[in-house]
């Protein structure tokens, strides 16, 4: 009888251990699946976040030049007007750009736009904001400098661009209008007026006041 009881005890113990082992295997499998799902969710969220970040950046930058676009300008300009009492706005236009496109082709026109963008960015400080405002027109927001100082900086850029050598010895020039917040609350309108004056004066000029 005792041997029989011992046998039943052993069988019962083995059976319980077998059930426990099967339960543990199921739990391990469950946690593996759960871990995989969580990992996929994390990776998916990271990928989605990076894609959204990329598309947001693309939405605020110009595709050709990689500087800020018109949408970015509208946002930053309003922020500057609301919060900053010492900033200048520059409106820049490539002179006779339609003739450049007509005579040398749009590919060369794109080269000119990229080259001028690069010159502007290199000659400005890191905190200055450069925008492709549209077509052959650019805008620049500069903080903590007064109008005369900004006009001098932009004139140096104008000279550098006029002296730049392009294909077939083509000469490209820019005109620019500068305005400061201390001169007018509507800085954009003032800068546009000064750009128009620069054009009227024969182009290849920077006008402030």
Give residue ranges: language-model regions.
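Active-site-proximal structural segments of metal-dependent nucleotidyl cyclase/transferase enzymes
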Residues: 76-104, 120, 187
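Alpha-helical scaffold within the catalytic cores of cyclic-nucleotide enzymes
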Residues: 117-118, 149-166, 192
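Conserved nucleotide-binding and Mg2+-coordinating catalytic segments in signaling enzymes
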Residues: 55-75, 92-106, 114
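A short pre-motif secondary-structure segment
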Residues: 129-132, 169-170
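Catalytic-core segments of nucleotide cyclases and related cyclic-nucleotide turnover enzymes
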Residues: 151, 179-209
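Short regulatory alpha-helical coupling segments
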Residues: 56-57, 70-86, 117-125, 143
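Signal-transducing coiled-coil linker helices
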Residues: 15, 23-63, 71-81
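Active-site-proximal alpha-helical element of nucleotidyl cyclase-like catalytic domains
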Residues: 108-129, 137, 161
């Amino acid at each position: 009888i005792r041997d029989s009881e011992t046998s039943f005890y052993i069988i019962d113990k083995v059976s319980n251990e077998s059930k426990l082992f099967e339960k543990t295997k199921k739990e391990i499998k469950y946690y593996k699946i759960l871990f995989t799902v969580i990992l996929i969710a994390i990776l998916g969220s990271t990928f989605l976040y990076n894609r959204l970040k990329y598309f947001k950046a693309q939405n605020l930058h110009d595709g050709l030049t990689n500087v800020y676009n018109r949408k970015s300008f509208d946002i930053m300009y309003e922020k500057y007007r609301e919060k900053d009492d010492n900033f200048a706005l520059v409106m820049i236009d490539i002179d006779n750009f339609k003739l450049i496109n007509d005579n040398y082709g749009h590919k060369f026109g794109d080269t000119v736009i990229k080259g001028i963008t690069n010159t502007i960015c290199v000659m400005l400080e890191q905190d200055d904001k450069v925008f492709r405002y549209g077509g052959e027109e650019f805008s620049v927001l500069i903080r903590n400098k007064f109008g005369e100082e900004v006009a001098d900086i932009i004139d140096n850029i104008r000279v550098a661009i006029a002296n730049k050598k392009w294909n077939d010895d083509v000469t490209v020039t820019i005109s620019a209008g500068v305005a400061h917040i201390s001169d007018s609350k509507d800085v954009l309108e003032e800068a546009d007026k000064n750009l128009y004056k620069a054009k009227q004066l024969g182009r290849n000029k920077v006008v402030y006041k």
